[in-house]
Amino acid sequence: MLFVFILFLPSCLGYIGDFRCIQLVNSNGANVSAPSISTETVEVSQGLGTYYVLDRVYLNATLLLTGYYPVDGSKFRNLALRGTNSVSLSWFQPPYLNQFNDGIFAKVQNLKTSTPSGATAYFPTIVIGSLFGYTSYTVVIEPYNGVIMASVCQYTICQLPYTDCKPNTNGNKLIGFWHTDVKPPICVLKRNFTLNVNADAFYFHFYQHGGTFYAYYADKPSATTFLFSVYIGDILTQYYVLPFICNPTAGSTFAPRYWVTPLVKRQYLFNFNQKGVITSAVDCASSYTSEIKCKTQSMLPSTGVYELSGYTVQPVGVVYRRVANLPACNIEEWLTARSVPSPLNWERKTFQNCNFNLSSLLRYVQAESLFCNNIDASKVYGRCFGSISVDKFAVPRSRQVDLQLGNSGFLQTANYKIDTAATSCQLHYTLPKNNVTINNHNPSSWNRRYGFNDAGVFGKNQHDVVYAQQCFTVRSSYCPCAQPDIVSPCTTQTKPKSAFVNVGDHCEGLGVLEDNCGNADPHKGCICANNSFIGWSHDTCLVNDRCQIFANILLNGINSGTTCSTDLQLPNTEVVTGICVKYDLYGITGQGVFKEVKADYYNSWQTLLYDVNGNLNGFRDLTTNKTYTIRSCYSGRVSAAFHKDAPEPALLYRNINCSYVFSNNISREENPLNYFDSYLGCVVNADNRTDEALPNCDLRMGAGLCVDYSKSRRAHRSVSTGYRLTTFEPYTPMLVNDSVQSVDGLYEMQIPTNFTIGHHEEFIQTRSPKVTIDCAAFVCGDNTACRQQLVEYGSFCVNVNAILNEVNNLLDNMQLQVASALMQGVTISSRLPDGISGPIDDINFSPLLGCIGSTCAEDGNGPSAIRGRSAIEDLLFDKVKLSDVGFVEAYNNCTGGQEVRDLLCVQSFNGIKVLPPVLSESQISGYTTGATAAAMFPPWSAAAGVPFSLSVQYRINGLGVTMNVLSENQKMIASAFNNALGAIQDGFDATNSALGKIQSVVNANAEALNNLLNQLSNRFGAISASLQEILTRLEAVEAKAQIDRLINGRLTALNAYISKQLSDSTLIKVSAAQAIEKVNECVKSQTTRINFCGNGNHILSLVQNAPYGLYFIHFSYVPISFTTANVSPGLCISGDRGLAPKAGYFVQDDGEWKFTGSSYYYPEPITDKNSVIMSSCAVNYTKAPEVFLNTSIPNPPDFKEELDKWFKNQTSIAPDLSLDFEKLNVTLLDLTYEMNRIQDAIKKLNESYINLKEVGTYEMYVKWPWYVWLLIGLAGVAVCVLLFFICCCTGCGSCCFKKCGNCCDEYGGHQDSIVIHNISSHED
């Protein structure tokens, strides 16, 4: 929505009667026509509309620059308004009040020759701003006395601003009549610039970027030069050309012109000469020719075929839309309000349809931290939301840790629950203590019902923050005064129930000490003292004299709505139609092609149109109220055949027909001169002459097609662009067969002529188990001398483990590569039904992809298979659990949920009639009704009391039986427990005796073992002496040599194993690479290689996981019959030009040379599609080198000689190892008596097993469904009606008898006799 100056901002703009502004009496309400559209277009070829980049000079360069430029070929709008002595109120609103967006380019006419003598302004003033009030900056470009006065100030614009060509009229010394400021306003720029007053027109270039405003100027139709730039830090949203008030000179025509066209961010190609002057410019997205120039970065591109991607495929512009001039949300004002709630009564406020600046907000409240949940904090800046809700409260100093996500402290369990599933940000900030008053309020209604008072319970400390430690919920029947010793009207009592707070809820109530509740006067209700409310605590919020506050910012509807952050907000841009652009429409992003349409199906609150698939299909611009359709950008290839002598190229939209090209605005040309469909796609700007053939072609389009251009054809035929699409045939087939010779002779070859479907299964190993080795343990075991000498081998063991780790890493990397190849682009599916019967099973691909989804842990026997009553039944029924000694379940099975069968399902227990002791509400009502009826109308209704009597008696029997079983079980438990205690005591005695005997024997053996150890020490001392003698006799060199020999042998074996591991890993690496290659070439695509994916020509391949590898199933067609043909590797035409076949052979067929494919014999004529032209018929020969492997075997020395070299005689002295076994005391224990006693105790414990009578627990539902209540209600109504007429007819209701009138008179005699009969019968 566009904002008109005074109509929407009366507090900011000039007021009526201000001597600096025009009076309303000098205005009128005449309508004004729309701005005129120029016939002149923006011609950027000479640099018009461009500008010299600040602080940069380019010499003799052609380069691409991205900036804010007009669209080449766009038109101007004249926004100048002329007045004499009055202005029109309609001048100050759209379409003359416009959106500034990225910027504007203006061409302004110099009116010096038309203005009266003494005039100081030769063109209107332009103002650029947002609110045009004293709180925002406004850019003013105003002419005065041959200079340009540029100012950026916080002006207050008049209600009816204008530019006067002679401001000194009537003694008014003001420069301009457009602002009301008496005192100088706040300015960031005020400068004057020289103006060439003799120029025909002035050219201005205004744009904004990153909060900075840029102004450029020129006095001739060329590139503009830098005027000034100023950082404003805000977005300028609109501009206005002030009306030009002037009385022209006599006889002159006065028509001010202020031509304006919008700027957009686009790419231009510039050419700079040796002086750094722009000599030519090209808008890269304006035409196909300009796109080719930008692609080649040349103003004169050469002849060729170019693949276009900038304009037709990739977005080349941006359409950005936000609702303009929304009010500020003022979230910071609410966050910094003096009254701050406690966690117990946290507050929420929702903001919608407004803007906020998150950076300013954080600075304003002096934020300490900001953490976001389910969204990156950086993504909040610049986003739009449906609405924003903010919850805040003061934080007790000791409970800050409770506000961490997932914490279960007091603040989150009993005060405020943070919703971890919501998109939100948690803000911690502080306020000075003098600006904060804590509002401690208990929101509980049931606490206040019994006398809760905030100040009386919590106190009045300004910075104490109250929080609940536990919350309680109560039923409506709860009364804390229901005690026998307290006078109170309470008659029933239910206990409070502890509860946690849910998301968005407050604490339901604090705990109550019921002993402190009561009232001497029962008519004044139940009142609790202040000290009776418990379960809360308090702490100060102050840290360093600042109160800590928590705010939870809930972000609702991300990327939708009109509640936007202005931190990274861009200015609105023009809606560019007909090209592929990126768009951001009120937070909805994407890319597409816009086309303006007339649509009446948008409601006033609707802006976006979607299709049935949820894709954005249309858009209504709130700024201009125009409607657009949005089509997807063309994602194919566009080939442009460009000839340097032609003004435009011929186009080929590959793989797409022309109807789609023009219906989706892919082409820039709405009505091209000519176009047609070919088998390559849509051809534009060329004639269809594919029936003609050319031997030479400069613009080859592929597939044997050529674009030919002729300047003469374009000149003589006005309906032709000069391009034509023809067939490219570099030679004539008949000429080939007349003068052709085979290159390098003829060869016989068998070529397939018939095929069958083949099936091939293949396993490729891609991984193996990992191996690690403890090198020292493998070589030396636990031998210390060996380990010491092994150190001399250096890093051999370290290298072993390094090699094994390298092998393991290699296996891991190959496994990741294989998994990546499988997961990218492999569509896994089962075999489709094909009507072929037979034992063919679907392939199970689940091991390949693993378990996906929430059904992984569920099966038919899992949680999903559990069955029970429905949720509706659980809602309509209450559950009651009964002790069942054997008849409750049988009773329930008999009734089947029909409570009227109560007495029909009486059970028998040990000969006694019993019923379950619990009755539902409906059963109680029924039996009560029967008992009441029996008491009211005896003896006729006495029978109605029989069911009640029987029910009571049977249920009393049920209670008695249950109590009897429980009593018998209690006696059995007591008896068995006593027996068990006796047996346990006896078992402990026997165990104590046995342990005594064991102790004496163990002590004796310990002494004997001590003697044995002394003897062993002596013997092993002798052994050590002998070994020492042996080592002394052996030379140190010989001992090391023996150890070294063993180490060498084992290291050799280990080295061989490591070599084998390396070799195996190399094989696995090769096979894994082959598996990846087969996945990519066989599974994801169809290969042309023979016998690579199965046997024969590949059709289809499937892959499945297997232990340590992949299992492939290939389908291919295998040749079953062949023909023998004479083939040639090439042909020589006329002895100077050669031909080579493409993916096939040249064969002789009936004496004529033809081409056939290598996989199937099918002779066809030789064309450029199946052959390649060579410059000569020469053949190059290469001889392969002769390389042979070395087959010599090494000759090692004789083994016996090497053994004798190291063998030495050894002598050993055996030590005396005899032991004195006589000193060992071998004692046998006799524990038979103690074991028997323990066995008896165990037997008694076993006999104490309690065989209790089974008492089950049965769960029954006691509430009837709604339809049963309906039937009971209808029956009750019927009974009441019946009783009413009985009372009338028997005279029992005299009042009713009088009201019935004549209705009952005719039965009066009969009624009296019945009454007398009843009385007499009763008296008898």
UniProtKB/Swiss-Prot annotation:
<dbReference type="InterPro" id="IPR044873">
    <property type="entry name" value="Spike_S2_CoV_HR1"/>
</dbReference>
<dbReference type="InterPro" id="IPR036326">
    <property type="entry name" value="Spike_S1_RBD_sf_bCoV"/>
</dbReference>
<feature type="region of interest" description="Fusion peptide 1">
    <location>
        <begin position="870"/>
        <end position="891"/>
    </location>
</feature>
<keyword id="KW-0843">Virulence</keyword>
<feature type="disulfide bond">
    <location>
        <begin position="894"/>
        <end position="905"/>
    </location>
</feature>
<dbReference type="GO" id="GO:0044177">
    <property type="term" value="C:host cell Golgi apparatus"/>
</dbReference>
<dbReference type="InterPro" id="IPR043002">
    <property type="entry name" value="Spike_N_sf"/>
</dbReference>
<keyword id="KW-0261">Viral envelope protein</keyword>
<feature type="glycosylation site" description="N-linked (GlcNAc...) asparagine; by host">
    <location>
        <position position="893"/>
    </location>
</feature>
<feature type="glycosylation site" description="N-linked (GlcNAc...) asparagine; by host">
    <location>
        <position position="1246"/>
    </location>
</feature>
<feature type="glycosylation site" description="N-linked (GlcNAc...) asparagine; by host">
    <location>
        <position position="31"/>
    </location>
</feature>
<dbReference type="InterPro" id="IPR002552">
    <property type="entry name" value="Spike_S2_CoV"/>
</dbReference>
<keyword id="KW-1032">Host cell membrane</keyword>
<feature type="transmembrane region" description="Helical">
    <location>
        <begin position="1266"/>
        <end position="1286"/>
    </location>
</feature>
<dbReference type="InterPro" id="IPR018548">
    <property type="entry name" value="Spike_S1_RBD_bCoV"/>
</dbReference>
<dbReference type="GO" id="GO:0020002">
    <property type="term" value="C:host cell plasma membrane"/>
</dbReference>
<dbReference type="GO" id="GO:0039654">
    <property type="term" value="P:fusion of virus membrane with host endosome membrane"/>
</dbReference>
<comment type="subunit">
    <text>Homotrimer; each monomer consists of a S1 and a S2 subunit. The resulting peplomers protrude from the virus surface as spikes. Cytoplasmic tail interacts with M protein. S1 interacts with murine CEACAM1, and weakly with murine CEACAM2 in tissue culture.</text>
</comment>
<keyword id="KW-0812">Transmembrane</keyword>
<dbReference type="InterPro" id="IPR044339">
    <property type="entry name" value="Spike_S1_NTD_MHV-like"/>
</dbReference>
<feature type="glycosylation site" description="N-linked (GlcNAc...) asparagine; by host">
    <location>
        <position position="1209"/>
    </location>
</feature>
<feature type="glycosylation site" description="N-linked (GlcNAc...) asparagine; by host">
    <location>
        <position position="688"/>
    </location>
</feature>
<dbReference type="GO" id="GO:0019031">
    <property type="term" value="C:viral envelope"/>
</dbReference>
<dbReference type="Pfam" id="PF19209">
    <property type="entry name" value="CoV_S1_C"/>
</dbReference>
<feature type="glycosylation site" description="N-linked (GlcNAc...) asparagine; by host">
    <location>
        <position position="1190"/>
    </location>
</feature>
<dbReference type="GO" id="GO:0019064">
    <property type="term" value="P:fusion of virus membrane with host plasma membrane"/>
</dbReference>
<feature type="disulfide bond">
    <location>
        <begin position="329"/>
        <end position="354"/>
    </location>
</feature>
<feature type="domain" description="BetaCoV S1-NTD">
    <location>
        <begin position="15"/>
        <end position="296"/>
    </location>
</feature>
<keyword id="KW-0946">Virion</keyword>
<feature type="short sequence motif" description="KxHxx">
    <location>
        <begin position="1320"/>
        <end position="1324"/>
    </location>
</feature>
<dbReference type="GO" id="GO:0016020">
    <property type="term" value="C:membrane"/>
</dbReference>
<feature type="glycosylation site" description="N-linked (GlcNAc...) asparagine; by host">
    <location>
        <position position="530"/>
    </location>
</feature>
<feature type="glycosylation site" description="N-linked (GlcNAc...) asparagine; by host">
    <location>
        <position position="737"/>
    </location>
</feature>
<feature type="site" description="Cleavage; by host">
    <location>
        <begin position="717"/>
        <end position="718"/>
    </location>
</feature>
<keyword id="KW-1015">Disulfide bond</keyword>
<keyword id="KW-1043">Host membrane</keyword>
<feature type="coiled-coil region">
    <location>
        <begin position="1227"/>
        <end position="1255"/>
    </location>
</feature>
<feature type="region of interest" description="Heptad repeat 1">
    <location>
        <begin position="970"/>
        <end position="1020"/>
    </location>
</feature>
<feature type="glycosylation site" description="N-linked (GlcNAc...) asparagine; by host">
    <location>
        <position position="60"/>
    </location>
</feature>
<feature type="glycosylation site" description="N-linked (GlcNAc...) asparagine; by host">
    <location>
        <position position="357"/>
    </location>
</feature>
<keyword id="KW-1168">Fusion of virus membrane with host membrane</keyword>
<feature type="disulfide bond">
    <location>
        <begin position="372"/>
        <end position="425"/>
    </location>
</feature>
